[in-house]
């Protein structure tokens, strides 16, 4: 690969923004930015309008709805892009786009690849107590299966929330790119193939997957609430037929009672018993305020 490659970036979230910021700091030759159109913002948790930031940096930028659109392919060829960074984008990159840059595409994933390939990695990481990471890798036709260029593991706290993990990822992206970008600038890459025999996969998550099952253990309910918290839609339950969305909670192992029942109310916060232990609800959203009382039942 030649030194001082021409770079383009496609993305839609904080990790995309962070990558663009670092590319600029390292004086990489960023010739274009492809920003997911604001019309798609509601479909993306933590959406970031990259076009606005790119224009602040005086980098040409265009919106896209489909990253595989022919107009994008033509623009990559017209600008002689050597490397396309695809960061923070859930759309599948098709073979035609993979082949468009002279030296391919670089992707990002917040797990220790080959473990944790797939979707909703941050939520699954908290839900299943996985090891998060910053991994930059060469995109190929598989799902997060290309050779690894840079990888740094991240410590997961016992009470981690998505927003705190995202902050850790953002700071670790800086460290990883401080290692990777000087190599790319010199025209050097040292890709390491993944061990596909050790691969694990994460499935797509939908809003309804945040429905709380109070017959689960308090630990499991606590993880579900944390995994679905901001910037995601939140875990939820129903009381008196009304939906409540829950964004934070605290374990209260000293309480035992019937699953899904309010066993205490402390400073306005209900303590709900589960199959094992209980949790105290913190941040709650509902159409109407709930007048919590001991003995109230939530839907199981």
Task: Describe the role of every protein-language-model region.
Residues 12-16, 65-69, 89-92, 229, ...:
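Short beta->alpha connector loops
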Residues 39-57:
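N-terminal beta-loop-helix "entrance" segment that forms/cooperates
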Residues 11, 33, 54, 84, ...:
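A residue-level signal for conserved active-site and pocket-lining positions in enzyme catalytic cores
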Residues 203-216:
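Acyl-group handling in specialized metabolite and lipid biosynthesis
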Residues 215-300:
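An anion-binding loop in the catalytic cleft
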Residues 31-37, 60-79, 84, 92-108:
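Internal alpha/beta domain cores that form substrate/cofactor-binding pockets in large enzymes
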Residues 1-44:
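N-terminal Rossmann-like dinucleotide-binding module
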Residues 4-5, 25-26, 83-201:
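Donor/substrate-binding cores of folate-linked one-carbon enzymes
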